[in-house]
C-alpha cells in the first residue's frame, strides 16, 4: 500500500505552504502558497540573496524615494520568489497583497494589478497566479473586481461561514479556510484537545465545502493552516489542501488506507440572495473566534511585512 501522501494526491490537489524551493522540489506539489511570514522566512535563506539584490536593483530604477524603493523591493522580491517556485511546479503560485490594505478595496485592487503586471512582464501569464487577499468585506469586494478582469484570487484568513458565503457570492476563484488557527482558539478557550473528527477547524471546512457543493458554487475550497496530519486526513477529498513541508513529511511516512471524507454532492439547491454589507458584518460578528482570528491574522502579517521592510531598508 502506498503512503498517505501518495493516497491523498489521488483525492485532493496537494499544495505546498512554503516559499522554500528545496521543500517544493522534494514534495512536488501542484501549486504553492506564500504569505508575508513565509516571504520573510525565505528572504533569510542564503540562496535567496540574489533575488533580493535583483529586487533592490529594480526598485532603484523605479523611484529615488527610499520609502517607495522599500515597497517596490518587497513587491518584486515576492514576485521573484514566486517566479522561482513556478519553475518547479506545474500549477499556480499564490502571492499576497500587503495585509495593511485589508480594509481598502481600491488600494488592494491597485496593488494586485501591480503584482500581476510584474509577473506578466516576466513572461508569466495570469493562469499561473493567484492573488491572495484577506477575507474582509473590502478584500472580497477587491477580489470581485479583479476576477472580472481575469485576475484569479485566493481569499485567505477565512474563519467564519459568513466570510465563506460572501466569497462564493462574489465569484472568487478560491478560498483558504483556516483549520489549525480555529482549533487553537477553541483549545485555549475550552482548555482541551480535540480528536481530529471533532476538530472545530475541520468541522468548519467541512460545512463550507458541503455548502458550496450543494449550491453549485464553483469557488475552490483549499483547507489551510494545519496543526497535525489528523486534521488533513479528515479533509481528504477537499478540492485542495495547502500543507507545510513538515506535515508533508509526516504524511509521506504514514502508512495505512486513506479514504475520502469529503465528497462532491454536485447539488443544485437554490442559492440565497447575496449578503449585504450589514448582513455580512453582523453574521461575522456573531462568531467571536472569527472576529478575533481575522484581526490577529491581519496584524501578524502586517508585523512580518514590517520586519521584511526593515530588513530591505537596511540593504538600500
UniProtKB/Swiss-Prot annotation:
Homodimer. SUPFAM superfamilies: Aldolase. Its EC number is 2.2.1.2. This is Transaldolase. One of its GO terms (biological process) is carbohydrate metabolic process. GO terms for cellular component: cytosol. It comes from Vibrio cholerae serotype O1 (strain M66-2). Keywords: Cytoplasm, Pentose shunt, Schiff base, Transferase. InterPro entries: Aldolase_TIM, TAL/FSA, Transaldolase_1, Transaldolase_AS. It catalyses: D-sedoheptulose 7-phosphate + D-glyceraldehyde 3-phosphate = D-erythrose 4-phosphate + beta-D-fructose 6-phosphate. The gene is tal. Its main location: cytoplasm. The keyword Cytoplasm applies. One of its GO terms (molecular function) is transaldolase activity. Pathway: Carbohydrate degradation; pentose phosphate pathway; D-glyceraldehyde 3-phosphate and beta-D-fructose 6-phosphate from D-ribose 5-phosphate and D-xylulose 5-phosphate (non-oxidative stage): step 2/3. It holds the Pfam family TAL_FSA. Transaldolase is important for the balance of metabolites in the pentose-phosphate pathway. PROSITE patterns: TRANSALDOLASE_1, TRANSALDOLASE_2.
